[in-house]
Regions:
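Preferential activation on post-signal-peptide N-terminal prodomains/segments
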Residues: 1-145
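Surface-exposed beta-strand edges and their flanking turn/coil or helix-capping segments
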Residues: 34-37, 149-152, 168, 175-178, ...
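Short, charged/polar low-complexity linear motifs in solvent-exposed/disordered segments
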Residues: 40, 179-181, 254-256
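Short, surface-exposed beta-strand/loop "edge" segments at domain boundaries and coil↔beta transitions
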Residues: 103-104, 142-148, 169-174, 232-238, ...
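Exposed beta-strand-loop-beta-strand "reactive/processing" segments of non-cytosolic proteins
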Residues: 115-157, 205-239
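Short low-complexity stretches enriched in small and charged residues
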Residues: 116-125, 183-194
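Short helix-loop boundary/capping segments
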Residues: 154-186
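Extracytoplasmic/luminal low-complexity segments enriched in Pro/Gly and acidic/polar residues
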Residues: 185-264
Length: 264
């Protein structure tokens, strides 16, 4: 074997060894990161991460938010609406009024909704999602908002033009899960989402989101999430302490019916 060939083999061997050691190092860091994320992440580490990605957050405000230690995971079905209600592709029901219904004020509006929707008492007004042309009411489960379950009232000149309803019923608790704290939730968010430069995380809280479980029987799974307000969006990350799925989902605050995304 000539020296040139031997040298090439030696170089290739070093490259392979370097790649192997690099892979081992990355795996070690990921393993350590997992331990930190679940058990040891603290405010100082979060603030360092925020600095690295050039994102601002009011940590005092975020840490003051009181959340439950545990929440249920539920199986549920979409409630059916009869009569003049028409079912839409995504499972919600809509009713259009011609002529439009008059309402004098917010109390008058809610009284009309109670007459039109038999389970309206399951919903609460969501000011952040509402506007002059649309009122949004979010379903409450275990005293926590379920963002997919909602009543939307579309207004024209102060009159009701149409109402859209998506309500979940026949809730069956499948399990109880422990929820991660705000530090772990922020860690998952920061390490799984590409923020715009100089973005701000304004607030954080817990909510449910629904996932289709059985499309034939119209069954859904209700899962607890942390959600954070950033810019014009809510960013959702699973709140389960086991962290099976750490993808970030985005929902537009001004258009909550827009399709969620995992991209910036």
């Amino acid at each position: 074997m000539d020296w040139s060939r031997a040298k090439n083999i030696l170089i290739i061997s070093f490259v392979i060894l370097d790649l192997f050691l690099g892979a081992q190092y990355i795996q070690m860091i990921q393993t350590q990161s997992k331990i930190i994320r679940e058990d040891q992440i603290n405010r100082r580490q979060i603030e360092e991460l925020l600095d690295q990605v050039h994102v601002r957050a009011n940590m005092d405000l975020l840490e003051r938010k009181m959340i439950p230690e545990q929440l249920g995971v539920y199986k549920a079905t979409v409630s059916e609406m009869e009569g003049s209600w028409k079912q839409e592709e995504q499972g919600s029901y809509i009713r259009t009024f011609s002529p439009r219904l008059s309402c004098k004020n917010e109390q008058d509006l809610e009284q009309i909704l109670k007459q039109q929707i038999p389970f309206f008492s399951d919903f609460r007004y969501a000011k952040a999602l509402s506007s002059d042309q649309r009122r949004v009411y979010v379903q409450i489960v275990d005293q926590v908002p379920l963002f997919n379950g909602k009543v939307e009232v579309f207004l024209e000149n102060g009159q009701i033009e149409s109402i859209r309803v998506l309500h979940f019923s026949q809730l069956e608790r499948l399990s109880v899960v422990s929820l991660v704290n705000v530090h772990t939730a922020l860690y998952r968010l920061i390490t799984n989402w590409e923020f715009n430069a100089n973005a701000t995380i304004k607030s954080g809280n817990i909510a449910y989101r629904s996932k289709v479980y059985n499309s034939v029987d119209n069954e859904h799974i209700l899962i607890p999430y942390w959600y954070f307000e950033s810019g014009k969006d809510y960013l959702f990350i699973q709140a389960n302490s086991r962290g099976q799925n750490e993808e970030v989902e985005k929902m537009s605050i001004s258009n909550p019916n827009s399709k969620g995304t995992n991209e910036t």
